[in-house]
């Protein structure tokens, strides 16, 4: 072997791990990398599994950041929350790119293993449901999907009854002296949020005097970023599904593309979009 072809090993690099934790042990890679179990013999099922598992890992981090941001805003610590919410947006942009990879799966390939999924569907993703709850889109009827696992059902029940990111953002408006209608402040937070004129008026004032309400303005823009990315994710989801299965019914029983098109119209922070027209 020529001198320049030899493997270079720096003297300080650790090679003896008999009594020390390794990279693989820290990340529990044996468990993580043994979780991709195909139910068919089709080569492309591995792609399908990995894409969805990777997305679930990213969603775990999104929930970690969203929940921390909600607690931070509750405690009037908006600056730390901005960093967490900005990170959520970056994660969302990463997840969106995964649709490009899944789109390499053709209809002919997917149909070879689709029956192996049974009634399993991304619609049942409990982490995605918890993200929706954290953002304020509450759907109590969806809890029935998770009754098979009582511990999981209890976690979702707790998430349903917890204040959302928008709930604490509205409370931040109140703390700044804005007058918000009592029906908003005393509403049933287990139900989807409905837009309100007093909330819109408050945000309009924030946007009209950015210097005075800089922190609230920054918070509002972070929320818009998150909803914008989420809508882009939904659109890419819808188009990828249409590309692979057309207008067939989803494995979970939904109408598939038709359902995904309808959810594109769901808004999390309606007043923040409305003020853009009224400024």
UniProtKB/Swiss-Prot annotation:
Q: What are the protein's UniProt keywords?
A: Dioxygenase, Heme, Iron, Metal-binding, Oxidoreductase, Tryptophan catabolism
Q: Tell me which family the UniProt entry assigns to this protein.
A: Belongs to the tryptophan 2,3-dioxygenase family.
Q: Which reaction does it catalyse?
A: L-tryptophan + O2 = N-formyl-L-kynurenine
Which parts of the sequence bind heme? 237
What's a BP term from Gene Ontology annotated to this protein? L-tryptophan catabolic process to kynurenine
- Answer whether the UniProt record assigns the keyword DNA repair to this protein: no
Q: What is its EC number?
A: 1.13.11.11
DNA-binding among keywords: no
Biological role stated in the UniProt entry: Heme-dependent dioxygenase that catalyzes the oxidative cleavage of the L-tryptophan (L-Trp) pyrrole ring and converts L-tryptophan to N-formyl-L-kynurenine. Catalyzes the oxidative cleavage of the indole moiety.
InterPro entries (alphabetical): Trp/Indoleamine_2_3_dOase-like (IPR037217), Trp_2-3-dOase_bac (IPR017485), Trp_2_3_dOase (IPR004981)
- One Pfam family per UniProt: Trp_dioxygenase
Q: What is this protein called?
A: Tryptophan 2,3-dioxygenase
User: What is the UniProt remark on how the cofactor binds and its stoichiometry?
Assistant: Binds 1 heme group per subunit.
Required co-factors: heme
> What is known about its subunit structure?
Homotetramer.
Q: Which amino acids does the record list as binding substrate?
A: 48-52, 110, 114, 251
GO molecular function: any one? heme binding
What is the organism field in this record?
A: Bacillus thuringiensis subsp. konkukian (strain 97-27)
The pathway that the record names for this protein is: Amino-acid degradation; L-tryptophan degradation via kynurenine pathway; L-kynurenine from L-tryptophan: step 1/2
């Amino acid at each position: 072997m020529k001198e320049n072809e030899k493997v270079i090993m720096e003297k300080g690099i650790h090679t003896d791990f008999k009594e020390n934790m390794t990279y693989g042990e820290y990340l529990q890679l044996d468990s993580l990398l043994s979780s991709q179990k195909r139910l068919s013999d089709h080569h492309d099922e591995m792609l399908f599994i990995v894409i969805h598992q990777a997305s679930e890992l990213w969603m775990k981090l999104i929930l970690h950041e969203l929940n921390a941001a909600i607690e931070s805003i509750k405690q009037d610590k908006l600056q730390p929350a901005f960093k967490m919410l900005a990170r959520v947006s970056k994660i969302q942009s990463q997840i969106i790119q995964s649709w490009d990879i899944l789109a390499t799966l053709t209809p002919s390939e997917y149909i070879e293993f689709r029956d192996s999924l049974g009634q399993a569907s991304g619609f049942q993703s409990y982490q995605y449901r918890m993200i929706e709850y954290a953002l304020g889109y509450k759907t109590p009827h969806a809890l029935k999907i998770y009754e098979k696992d009582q511990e999981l059902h209890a976690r979702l029940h707790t998430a349903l009854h917890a204040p959302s990111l928008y709930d604490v953002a509205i409370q931040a408006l109140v703390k700044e002296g804005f007058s918000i209608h009592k029906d908003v402040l005393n509403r049933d937070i287990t139900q989807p949020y409905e837009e309100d004129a007093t909330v819109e008026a408050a945000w309009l004032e924030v946007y009209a005097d950015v210097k005075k309400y800089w922190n609230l303005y920054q918070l509002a823009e972070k929320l818009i970023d998150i909803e914008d990315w989420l809508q882009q994710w939904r659109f890419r989801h819808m188009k990828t599904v249409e590309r692979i299965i057309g207008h067939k019914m989803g494995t979970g029983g939904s109408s598939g593309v038709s359902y995904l098109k309808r959810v594109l119209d769901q808004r999390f922070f309606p007043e923040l979009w409305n003020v853009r027209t009224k400024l």
